[in-house]
Amino acid sequence: MSASSGDVHGAMVHSMQGMESEHMMSALPGSKSSFALSAIAADDPEPPTDFQLGSLTKEIKTANPETQALFDQGLRFYCAFNFRESYRAYKAALKRDPDCVMCRWGIAMSLGVNINQLDQPEQDRRIAQQMLRDALRIRDADPKERALVEALLPRYEAHRQIPDESERQNRRNKDYAGAMTALARRYPDDPDIQTLYADAVMNLRPWEYWDRQGNPAYHDIPPAVDAVEGGLKAHAEHMGLVHWYIHIREGSTEPNVVTPFADKLPDLAPGAGHLVHMPSHIYYRTGDHLKSFEANQKATLSDETYFKKVDAGPGGGIAHPDGDRYRWGYYRHNIHFALASAILTGNVEDMNWAADRLRRSEGEGVTFRTDRYRGVYYQSLPYFMSPGEILQQPPPDGTAKDWRYARISWDYAQVLAHVRKRDAGGARRAYVQLDKDVIAFRNERRDEVMGHQAAQIMQSVAHARIDQMNGDAQSGVRVLERSAGQQDAMNYDEPPYWMVPVRQTLAALLIDLGRYDNAIKVLHASLGNDDPNRDLYTSFKGNGWAYFGLTQAYERKGIENLTPGQREDYDGARKRLAEYCPPAGRACALSLDRM
């Protein structure tokens, strides 16, 4: 029998549940989703087909060339984490061949959870389950295709006997990972299945693959790494394998092993902004912040080209400010990452470009993400703007409750601007307001743990700089020593929730006090050079501010007084610094009062 193509969305197509989804990379790890993708994308027009997504293909059982082409487009978008585009490509493929087993499998895959969205909207779960059940009723299915459908089906079981929804989802994830583990052993030479197996394992505990020293956190991580690396030996240009390889390796002690593959990824799918961005996860971890910025700048421009294409397409595009996860999540993640990378180079032009792009990327109304990103914008200003320019920046408009994090960040930037102008009264007034806004933030949003930690850092840095301005840098040192420990306790996020090491500011105050050896030690700690077992989450490798601080400390100590080892360290810091701030060319913001 042939399964009816019918209405993919079913009777619940326009229902929406819960709060707005938060993309983990731009929000809190483990955040919950909101709107069912099948509802958001219900009225999306037929997809264009000229997205420059490369040549990844998986031959499926169909006699229709358009179905095959659209299936491949869905697979490429799935590998690029644009699940909405993946979903509409698979729907279009199924429309052309109602007997296509893999088209139904693809629809179900695109409606599932992923490492950046941990829950499963009930509407999406039901539609995915029905798609897979219908696929199993299709006669003469290819054995491997049927096996993929059977492996995916546990991901969408209802499990009504389990009272808690999060526990139901954990059970689904575990059962799916078990099924994909078995399938990966059955088809060891299929790169798509190896990718899906690694993805299933990673979804068991998203972003918790390695401990804070870079060792595997769970027993199932090494086999997943082996599967991806084995697949890459024969399929080095498989965009899915490379994408998941970056994610599964970035938190390890050896992110550099991914670099040769990461370097090639943007050219494999130049029209997929998220894949153009992905190498920066490795470049950032290995301390190559110029390349990290460049990757994210290119990714941002790639996404903007994509938006123009879909917005100009049939039906007027797919921009839905109420829940388009890609546009309001992944796109702005590129810009955030570009800004975080640019800050660590001290490049004024790059920081200005990214900060301006981030500010102009708003447009969905005030949400958690909007508040967070406006806060990031304000936090960046002291690194490249003059005090006068910062003081001219208006605070967020609208209700204070909507902008708690952004308002704290604005207060913080105001304090530092007044300090640099040596305006003690202005700094004190801004700090009093900062304190008030931090208290309100804690009282109203108790669950935003990392936001509270970042707010505490802003208080500490502002307090220390005021102490320094008032001639009591030693008091500021004590404040920052405590704050550095608090930053060490923050969870992994990429880029880090607080974009620079507190230790660089601590070093600036130590240099001011003439404690050059202490400053050098602190700066090496910020770079992760002091201890090979240092917590990977607390290291900012390749940070230009640290190299600048090292050169300042050594020069004030007296070049003629350096030991051979110190001279070697000084020369190395100058060499790295020259990469970010060459004698002629880029405008460089690196200075002790900005650190």
Which residues make up each language-model segment?
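N-terminal alpha-helical interaction modules that lie
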Residues: 2-245, 253-255, 263, 267-269, ...
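Residue register of alpha-helical TPR repeats
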Residues: 68, 102, 150, 240, ...
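Catalytic cores of extracellular degradative/oxidative enzymes
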Residues: 262-263, 270, 274, 280-285, ...
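Phosphate/diphosphate-binding loops
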Residues: 308, 335
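Carbohydrate-binding/catalytic loop surfaces
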Residues: 315-329, 375-379, 450-459, 504
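C-terminal non-catalytic interaction modules
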Residues: 521, 525-527, 531-595
